[in-house]
Amino acid sequence: MAPLNVEVIVGSVREGRMGRAVADWFVERATANPSWNVSVIDLRELSLPQDFSDSPATEVFRRRIGRADAVVAVTSEYNHGYPAALKTAFDSVKHEWRAKPIGFVSYGGISGGVRAVEQLRQVVAELHMVSVRQSVTIHRVRKQFGHEPYGVDSIAIDASEKMIRELDWWGGGLRMQRASDPYPG
């Protein structure tokens, strides 16, 4: 079977963000899986238009999500919610999300971004995605990712391994199903 194409989306675009460091940590873990082909979409670099107009950035995003077999959203939590740039990304394309699994890597202070993930699960359900049960939560992100080498706790490491297995299972199954019987939604 061909490797799964997995897109990791960095959802925060703020100055001083920790999202890229967290995403790079997850990508390092994910690329250890030989059945995955992992790419990163950094929303800070892509600059999707907020008015959802067609643009070269939107077309690039549409193609990459269309080719993906699974998605991982790396999200911070701002004021008990997820970043606006991430919502713009989800709203910028439509059919490309359908019948694909998604996992979440969240980070923040004491809550670790769990409230952002709770809200995102509702959004992706409306997009006809399958949210895997396991997520990765990075509590006190500046303590764990503030300097190299990163001191990520064992709970997050274990969660990442479980989430990768779940995404692998769903990604392979849904890819075969989409190929044999296109999603009717």
Q: Language-model segments: what does each one mean?
A:
Residues 1-93, 147, 151-185:
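N-terminal beta1-alpha1-beta2 submodule of the flavodoxin-like/Rossmannoid cofactor-binding fold
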Residues 88-95, 122-127:
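A glycine- and small-aliphatic-rich helix-loop capping segment at beta-alpha/alpha-beta transitions
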Residues 96, 144-145:
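A short secondary-structure junction motif
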Residues 98-100:
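His-Asp phosphorelay/catalytic-motif detector in bacterial-type signaling
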Residues 102-142, 154-159:
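Short, glycine-/small-residue-rich phosphate/pyrophosphate-handling segment
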